[in-house]
A protein has these predicted regions:
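Short, conserved beta-turn/loop elements at beta-strand boundaries and strand-helix junctions
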Residues: 18-24, 38-39
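Short aromatic-glycine-enriched beta-strand elements
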Residues: 22-32
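Beta-strand/loop nucleic-acid-binding surfaces
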Residues: 42-69
Length: 160
């Protein structure tokens, strides 16, 4: 990802404007663009929605798949790598998506977070969200968390 993400057609620093909006089995979140590192026809101060094909939720099973990265929190700044507009607007605001071919959501907080590793066992890696709700990343061991943090630090140095 260190090589792939910097080649993304759209790289932005954003701040969430609203909490995530759930629809069908997924969600999207409205953000304000703070800085454009790459991408055409995008400007600081404008608002867009961000979505990801891998963000899934099942109300019946009480499960969410956040692609290893937590929701963006109000008032914080994030570095996001987007692939394209999905050709759809919500309330006149264009919707962009994270790259489909990545299992990990390409969203990185400019803040430092305390990440809790919640013990898992058996076949499932699902954990109670309330136990990890302040995390930036979700990992099952320190090796995985260290890899996320190394990638984050590399990217934040590049896109300050």
């Amino acid at each position: 990802l260190k090589k792939i993400l910097p080649e993304s057609p759209i790289i932005l620093k954003v701040t969430p404007v609203d909490p995530p909006e759930f629809f069908f089995k997924g969600w999207q979140q409205k953000v304000r663009i703070e800085q454009v590192f790459s991408g055409e026809n995008l400007a600081s101060g404008s608002e867009i929605y961000i979505t990801f094909d891998r963000w899934k939720a099942s109300v019946a099973r009480k499960e969410m798949n956040l692609s290893f990265v937590n929701f963006m929190k109000d008032g914080a700044e994030y570095l996001v790598f987007l692939s394209e507009s999905i050709g759809y607007t919500k309330d006149g605001i264009e919707v962009f998506q994270l790259p489909k071919d990545h299992a990990i959501a390409s969203v990185f907080s400019y803040e430092v977070h305390d990440n809790v590793i919640y013990p898992v066992s058996g076949e499932s890696t699902y954990v109670p969200y309330k136990e990890v709700s302040d995390n930036e990343f979700f990992a099952v061991d320190t090796e995985g968390l260290d890899a996320f943090l190394e990638l984050k630090n590399f990217l934040l140095e590049k896109y300050k």
